[in-house]
Amino acid sequence: MINAIIDLYTKADIKTISSKLLRSSRWQQHHFTAMGSLQAQPLWLDFLAQYGVSELISKTHSKGQELETLQLILQPKKLLKPVRLSFVIKHNNTFIKSVKCVVDTLLLANNEFTGEASNNTLVIPKLPKSDPIMVCDLDNQLHPTTFHATPSDICELPTQTAETLNNWWQIWQLNNLANFESVYAKNADVILAGSNETQSKDALLNCHLALSQTLSRCYAQLETVQFDSALNQATICWTLDGTFNAKNIRVRQQILTVITITNTLISSEVMQFDTLALNQQFAL
């Protein structure tokens, strides 16, 4: 499964990955859900046509009980700088049941084409029409009495890992920003959407504060949690609902976070989301 996804981008091998998808298989990308290979192929062809076949710079692969995570850094032939794609995959060793693919479109938009014939210096990805969605408002009376799931509620985790991830989740669900000091190692490495550069945990705090200024009445909610005990690495798919202040509309940002834990502290974190797909979905 992993090699089939890698070969799709590095060899333009559409046949192999198509054979892994059933009609009921879901491939989610750019906030759009494709059912089966016939609907997914246009997504793959658009990427290959716009950016070309890629060279694999690096890959990171982790396994949980039901899900696998694949992180790729690719160097497309038509672009000057590498791009990052992250996948959360569910399969039965024969067929793929679902794939959640997060393309860092902000990194693409900040990229440039290599060919002099191209007049466009900004790489604007060709995006499909997003899935229709209605984001409910936050009920201030119901919210305090509602059960709010934590990572350990939806994934079997070692005790110390559960405590670390639950405390991390409080940063986003409860705005407990003091946990940045207690949950992260002092020299923790952070990679955020829009950049391949490693940053400090201060960049993550600044990201949280920037989101708080852009979105009000926020609510963070878990989708899936996967844990690889061999790598001590967790992958969390989650959403952040909020009112986009500039237009006073409710939006939902889909986020994929990969966390590595060392000695009960977070030593590295990759936080990815599709910025341009969000802008298109809600006309921001």
How would you describe each model-predicted region?
Residues M1, Q39, K81, Q160, ...:
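Soluble or luminal CAZymes and related metallo-dependent hydrolases
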Residues M1-S19, R23, L107-A178, S182, ...:
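Short, low-complexity N-terminal intrinsically disordered segments enriched in polar/charged residues
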Residues I2, L21, W44, L70, ...:
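Hydrophobic alpha-helical core bundles mediating ligand binding, dimerization, or RNAP-core interactions
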Residues A4, W27-H30, P76, S152-C155, ...:
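A general structural-boundary detector
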Residues I14-E66, L177-L231:
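A solvent-exposed, acidic/Ser-Thr-rich amphipathic alpha-helical stretch
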Residues L45-L157, L209-Y219, T224-L284:
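A beta-strand edge to alpha-helix "cap/lid" segment located at domain peripheries
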